[in-house]
Regions:
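Domain-level detector of nuclease and nuclease-like folds
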Residues: 69-202
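Low-complexity, glycine/serine/proline-rich disordered segments
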Residues: 1-91, 99-105, 111-113, 196-202
């Protein structure tokens, strides 16, 4: 901490060290701060300091896996994502879903985790919405989910955007235990302020 007790402007690594030394937070709350690469915002809750997830420029570790407990932005329009303690994508959201203007689909990374026979590379933010073709936006989806249930919702979004309407999206991705194959997608979205929700089993 600074001499006056302030934490303003500290790097993630400095704050992580300070928090551990001061013993004002539990170890698991510090998670991967040394590698986050961002200046942190910190606060207090019930007299105990808390560490918020922060946006990191590079969500991947040296092995090419997503880092745990981070927020990041990716894709053509920098949509928002979060990972859980196991480095699995747990949420993606945007207040302004957009359609890409480029022609043709991007080649995507097919080495996604948790896939079983027949699974597809499920883009959380679809290619037509400028979604990333990398593992920071791809999870294992059943053929039915990818080509039918999820796609039907995406078609609604695309139609609304093409009509000049505003679309927001928030999707929580659920897993079974420590597995990397999603078991459910809890989809919430608005079209010009009208709210819709749907749960899709995978």
């Amino acid at each position: 901490f600074l001499e006056n007790g302030s934490r303003e402007g500290l790097t993630s690594a400095e704050l992580a060290d300070a928090l551990l030394v001061s013993q004002k937070v539990e170890y698991e709350d510090v998670w991967d701060l040394r590698n986050a690469g961002d200046v942190l915002e910190s606060g207090s809750k019930g007299g105990t300091s808390t560490v918020q997830k922060v946006f990191t420029d590079n969500p991947f570790d040296e092995a090419g896996n997503l880092k745990p407990n981070i927020k990041y932005q990716t894709g053509e329009f920098k949509y928002n994502y979060e990972t859980d303690a196991n480095g699995r994508i747990s949420n993606w959201n945007t207040d302004n879903l957009q359609l890409t203007e480029r022609d043709g689909r991007l080649n995507y990374n097919s080495d996604f985790l948790g896939k079983i026979e027949g699974d597809h590379a499920g883009h959380l933010a679809g290619d037509r919405f400028g979604g990333s073709p990398e593992l920071d936006n791809i999870v294992s989806q059943s053929q039915n989910v990818n080509l039918s249930q999820y796609k039907k919702i995406e078609n609604q979004w695309a139609k609304a955007i093409s009509e000049g309407k505003e679309v927001t999206v928030n999707i929580d991705i659920k897993y079974d235990g420590d597995g990397f194959r999603p078991i459910e997608f809890n989809v919430e979205y608005t079209i010009d302020g009208d709210f819709f929700s749907q749960s899709i089993l995978n």
